[in-house]
C-alpha cells in the first residue's frame, strides 16, 4: 500500500483517492486568503522567536522565506496544488521548498483551526474598511443630489398610491438614513472582527509559552479572543457581516426598484445614463435599467449566502468541524457583490437626470392634497374625524366629476363645509403642502435642509 505523504499522513496507512481529494480540497477558493495566511505566519513566527520557543536565527530564516513567498504571491508567481488541500498546506509546502525542513517549525504551537480563523478575521477586517469607504461615497453622492432638489416636488406614496406631496430631496434623505445605519452596523461588525484567534491552537490552547497578546499586537488586532474554544469554533463575525450585507442589499434593492419604476414610460420621473442601461435585441426603442435590476436580483444571492451559513452553523458541536470549510465562498462572493453594487448605485445616482416638471405635474393631477384640506378644517376647530369624512365625500364626488380638488369653485366647496374660505386654494397647492410640514423629520423645505446639513457634517467627520 502506498505511503500517505500528506503533512498529516503519519497516522494513516492508505492514501486518499484523487476524486475524494478534489471533493475535500478548498484551494480553488481559499487561495484568496493567501496574503493573510502569510501575514499571520509572519506574526506567529516572530512571536515564537521573541518568546524563545524558536531561536531568533530560526525565526529570522523562516521570516525571510515567508517574505519571499509574499513577494512572489504579489507578483502572481505562485502555483497552488490541489493535492495540498488548502491554502495553509500549500504555503507550508512552498515554504519547505524554499528553506527546507526548518519550515516545519513554523507550525509549532499552532493549528490550522486558529490559522484559518486568523486569516478570515484579517481578510474581513480589511474588506470592512473598503465597504465603509464605498458607503461613505454613496452617501456623499446622495447628499449632493438631495442638495440640488430640496424644492423639487414629487408624490409620496403608500401602497403605491399617491399619498402626500413631498420633496424629492426628502425621499433621498430617507435612503441616506438607511445607508447611515448600514454604516453603523458594519462599524459594529468591525468590533467583533477585530479579535485575534491566533494561538488558540486546535481548541484548548497550547503547552508552549506563547504570547498571544504579542501576536495580536503584531497583527494590529484590538485584543486576542479570551477563550480558545470560542476562537476556533464560531463564525458569528462572518454571519454578522452577511446579515449586515443582506440589509444593505435590501436597502439598495428597494432604491433600485423605485428607480426602475421612475424611469418607466408611466412615470418618467428620471432618466438613467446610457452607461447604466442596455437595449433590446429585438425592440429598437428599448432602454432597459439592467444595472438597477441586477442589484435587485443580486440581493437574493446575498440573502442565500446568509441563510446558507446559518444552516451550516446551526447544529455544529464545538470545536472545529469540516463543515466550516463552507464559510468562505459565500463571504468572498458577498464582499465582491456589495462592493460592486455600491459602485454601480453611486454611479447611477451621480449621472441620472431628474425630470422636475414631470414630478411636479404628477402632484397636480391626483388627490395627494386631500390631507391638506382635512388638516385645514381641523385647524379651524372641526374634529379631525369629521374633517376626514367631509374630504372623503368631496374626493368621491371629484372622481365622479373628473375634477381635482382645486377645480371646485369656492361656493361648491362651501356646500361640503362652511369653514372653507378663499385661502383654501393656497393650502391645496403641492408646494404649500410640502412647506407646511415642518415638524421634526418632516418634508418641509427647512427641515430637509437641516437634515442635509446635519448629514453632511457627519459624513465629512468620517473622512
Swiss-Prot record:
It comes from the Bacteria. Belongs to the lyase 1 family. Argininosuccinate lyase subfamily. GO terms for cellular component: cytosol. This is Argininosuccinate lyase. The lineage of its organism: Bacteria, Bacillati, Bacillota, Bacilli, Lactobacillales. It is found in: Cytoplasm. Pathway: Amino-acid biosynthesis; L-arginine biosynthesis; L-arginine from L-ornithine and carbamoyl phosphate: step 3/3. It catalyses: 2-(N(omega)-L-arginino)succinate = fumarate + L-arginine. Pfam families: ASL_C2 (PF14698), Lyase_1 (PF00206). GO terms for molecular function: argininosuccinate lyase activity. HAMAP family: Arg_succ_lyase (MF_00006). It is an enzyme of class 4 (lyase). InterPro entries: Arg_succ_lyase_C, Argininosuccinate_lyase, Fumarase/histidase_N, Fumarate_lyase_CS, Fumarate_lyase_fam, Fumarate_lyase_N, L-Aspartase-like. Its EC number is 4.3.2.1. It comes from Streptococcus pneumoniae (strain JJA). CDD domains: Argininosuccinate_lyase. Keywords: Amino-acid biosynthesis, Arginine biosynthesis, Cytoplasm, Lyase. One of its GO terms (biological process) is arginine biosynthetic process via ornithine.
Amino acid at each position: 500500500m502506498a505511503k500517505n505523504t500528506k503533512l498529516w499522513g503519519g497516522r494513516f496507512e492508505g492514501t486518499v483517492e484523487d476524486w475524494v481529494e478534489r471533493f475535500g480540497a478548498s484551494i480553488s477558493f481559499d487561495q484568496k486568503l493567501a496574503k493573510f495566511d502569510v501575514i499571520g505566519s509572519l506574526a506567529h513566527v516572530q512571536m515564537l522567536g521573541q518568546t524563545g520557543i524558536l531561536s531568533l536565527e530560526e525565526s529570522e530564516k523562516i521570516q525571510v522565506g515567508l517574505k519571499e513567498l509574499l513577494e512572489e504571491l504579489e507578483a502572481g508567481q505562485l502555483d497552488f496544488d490541489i493535492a495540498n488541500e488548502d491554502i495553509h498546506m500549500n504555503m507550508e509546502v512552498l515554504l519547505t521548498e524554499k528553506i527546507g525542513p526548518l519550515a516545519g517549525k513554523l507550525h509549532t504551537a499552532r493549528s490550522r483551526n486558529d490559522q484559518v480563523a486568523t486569516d478570515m478575521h484579517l481578510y474581513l477586517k480589511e474588506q470592512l474598511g473598503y465597504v465603509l469607504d464605498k458607503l461613505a461615497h454613496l452617501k456623499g453622492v446622495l447628499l449632493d443630489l438631495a442638495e440640488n432638489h430640496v424644492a423639487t416636488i414629487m408624490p409620496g406614496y403608500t401602497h403605491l398610491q399617491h399619498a402626500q406631496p413631498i420633496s424629492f430631496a426628502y425621499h433621498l434623505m430617507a435612503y441616506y438614513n438607511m445607508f447611515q445605519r448600514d454604516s453603523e452596523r458594519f462599524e459594529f461588525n468591525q468590533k467583533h472582527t477585530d479579535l485575534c484567534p491566533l494561538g488558540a491552537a486546535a481548541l484548548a490552547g497550547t503547552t508552549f509559552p506563547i504570547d498571544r497578546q504579542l501576536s495580536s499586537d503584531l497583527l494590529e488586532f484590538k485584543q486576542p479572543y479570551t477563550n480558545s474554544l470560542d476562537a476556533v469554533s464560531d463564525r458569528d463575525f462572518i454571519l454578522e457581516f452577511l446579515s449586515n450585507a443582506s440589509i444593505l442589499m435590501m436597502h439598495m434593492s428597494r432604491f433600485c426598484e423605485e428607480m426602475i419604476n421612475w424611469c418607466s414610460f408611466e412615470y418618467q420621473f428620471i432618466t438613467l445614463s446610457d452607461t447604466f442601461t442596455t437595449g433590446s435585441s429585438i425592440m429598437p426603442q428599448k432602454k432597459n435599467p439592467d444595472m438597477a435590476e441586477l442589484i435587485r436580483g443580486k440581493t437574493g444571492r446575498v440573502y442565500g449566502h446568509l441563510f446558507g451559513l446559518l444552516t451550516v452553523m446551526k447544529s455544529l458541536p464545538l470545536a472545529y468541524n469540516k463543515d466550516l470549510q463552507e464559510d468562505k465562498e459565500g463571504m468572498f462572493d458577498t464582499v465582491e457583490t456589495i462592493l460592486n453594487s455600491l459602485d454601480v448605485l453611486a454611479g447611477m445616482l451621480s449621472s441620472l437626470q431628474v425630470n422636475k416638471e414631470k414630478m411636479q405635474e404628477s402632484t397636480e393631477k391626483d388627490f395627494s392634497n386631500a390631507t391638506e384640506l382635512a388638516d385645514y378644517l381641523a385647524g379651524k376647530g372641526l374634529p379631525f374625524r369629521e374633517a376626514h369624512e367631509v374630504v372623503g365625500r368631496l374626493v368621491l364626488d371629484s372622481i365622479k366629476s373628473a375634477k381635482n380638488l382645486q377645480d371646485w369653485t369656492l361656493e361648491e366647496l362651501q356646500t361640503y363645509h362652511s369653514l372653507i374660505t378663499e385661502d383654501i386654494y393656497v393650502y391645496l397647492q403641492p408646494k404649500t403642502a410640502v412647506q407646511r410640514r415642518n415638524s421634526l423629520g418632516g418634508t418641509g423645505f427647512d427641515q430637509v435642509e437641516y437634515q442635509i446639513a446635519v448629514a453632511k457634517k457627519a459624513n465629512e467627520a468620517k473622512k
